[in-house]
Amino acid sequence: MHGLDDAQYLQQKAHNKRISEFRSSSNSGINVTVVLKYTNGVVQVYNWQGTEVIAGSLNRQLMKFPNYMNPDKHGRIEWPGEGVEHQHGLIRSNGGNGSYDIGAGDPYAMQFIVQGSVDWNATRLRFFGPDGSRWMPDDQGGASVRAGLLNAAEDIINSKMQPLYFCDRMAGKSYYVRFDDKYAPRFPTIGFEVYRYRVGATNEMGGESARTAVASLISFPTFSTAYVNEKVAVENFFQPRELVYQNSYGYTV
């Protein structure tokens, strides 16, 4: 016997089938560049390659991240993604109401640049806690988030997910993710997966999977890596005219 109830067994069997399909697909080999952009202009760049589809964790202690925030009198801070980009629709929030709010206490942003044969128009991110569960507490909308993460792509981020946001940029070629450091003591580890959604995806709880996994970052470099200058990082890792945004430091890529 497999030791699982029928529903668990079928779910695990379907999961194994998706992994097998993914590993034999043309999307199985990808490169991921992770850029940590601090609000003081410092950038850290990491690269990752792989084909494994394993729900790993970043194993980063969020409380170790310095908080460079300088909120204004309204408790807001400038963040890449506001202003010009928002007005021109280069960034689309999945908050449900078409907008998002950036609050004080945001320690850092992550930018994910994924390169490879991926369906960019249907790529999203999914977040996990240390034990593989959704990391939002129930009293902060965690139950809604756990349900929302099982829905189709457009329903993944709902307006209750204040501690994090992500957005599309330029047909999905990169992502900004913001974490609120007030949750750091309770949720010291964050794992994430990058998913490709099938066209016409429906609620996964209905039985048929709505997702095909593209990649999981199953390991992550330590943050002892030397900082790099933001301008150097931008010149090295962004293609002008492909990724266009104006950040809070005054120049446009």
Curated annotation (Swiss-Prot):
The keyword Ribonucleoprotein does not apply. One of its GO terms (cellular component) is viral occlusion body. It comes from the Viruses. Keywords: Viral occlusion body. Major component of the virus occlusion bodies, which are large proteinaceous structures (polyhedra), that protect the virus from the outside environment for extended periods until they are ingested by insect larvae. This is Polyhedrin. The lineage of its organism: Viruses, Riboviria, Orthornavirae, Duplornaviricota, Resentoviricetes.
